[in-house]
A protein has these predicted regions:
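Conserved donor-binding/catalytic core segment of Leloir-type glycosyltransferases
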Residues: 1-11, 17-21, 29
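Nucleotide-activated donor-binding/catalytic signature segment of Leloir-type glycosyltransferases, i.e.
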Residues: 38-58
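Short alpha-helical donor nucleotide-sugar binding micro-motif in glycosyltransferases
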Residues: 54-55, 62-67
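Aromatic "clamp/platform" in nucleotide-sugar-dependent glycosyltransferases that forms part
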Residues: 75
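Short hydrophobic beta-strand element within catalytic cores of glycosyltransferases
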Residues: 92-95, 105
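C-terminal alpha-helical cap of glycosyltransferases
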Residues: 132, 156-176
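A short, well-ordered alpha-helix in the C-terminal region of glycosyltransferases
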Residues: 139-153
Length: 176
């Protein structure tokens, strides 16, 4: 399992730990750095988690490509460009069914969505979505291929235009 991004509280990376507890053979690579790293190191202590640090270029592409799944637990993202990076590398995504994420991820087609709400903070849904993605090699390969195709369709121009659209909506709402 792979997470790439800033290690900060708003990314809700702690939500991944129940997945590791439920899937004892799973290993997690946290790629990136940030102000929340020390807290995360304590939180994930005793799990099969590696704090990789910052990567770029071919090393980052290799990290994405080596993952069976990219876990993106944040429920507050307007558009996670790292999702497109993961998908372009053929790493299927498990992401929250919130914000701009469902605009990119079609559940069961090019990745899996989880419901981040609930008394358990979405843990059961995240575990179920991750199990679903990891459970069948043939289906996962189909998700990989569809993820690559979707990333090609979006490209950076499409992602940027979507973000501009969100800003236009906010401005129009606030001006009226």
């Amino acid at each position: 399992l792979v997470y790439v991004g800033r290690l900060s509280a708003e990314k809700q990376i702690e939500r991944i730990k129940p997945v590791l507890n439920a899937l004892p053979d799973a290993r997690l690579a946290l790629v990136g750095d940030g102000p929340h790293r020390q807290q995360l190191e304590k939180h994930f202590e005793g799990t099969a988690t590696t704090f990789v640090g910052y990567l770029a270029g071919e090393e980052l592409a290799s990290a994405y490509a080596s993952g069976d799944a990219f876990l993106f637990p944040s429920s507050t993202e307007t558009l996670g460009l790292v999702l497109l990076e993961a998908m372009a590398a053929g790493c299927p995504v498990v992401g929250a069914n919130r914000g701009g994420i469902p605009d990119i991820i079609s559940d069961g087609t090019n990745g899996c969505l989880y419901e981040p709400d609930g008394a358990d903070g979405g843990a059961a849904s995240l575990i179920e979505a991750t199990r679903k993605l990891l459970g069948n090699d043939i289906e996962r390969q189909g998700l990989r291929n569809a993820a690559r195709s979707e990333a090609e369709r979006w490209g950076w121009a499409g992602a940027t235009e979507q973000l501009r659209g969100y800003y236009r909506q906010v401005l129009e709402t606030n001006l009226t």
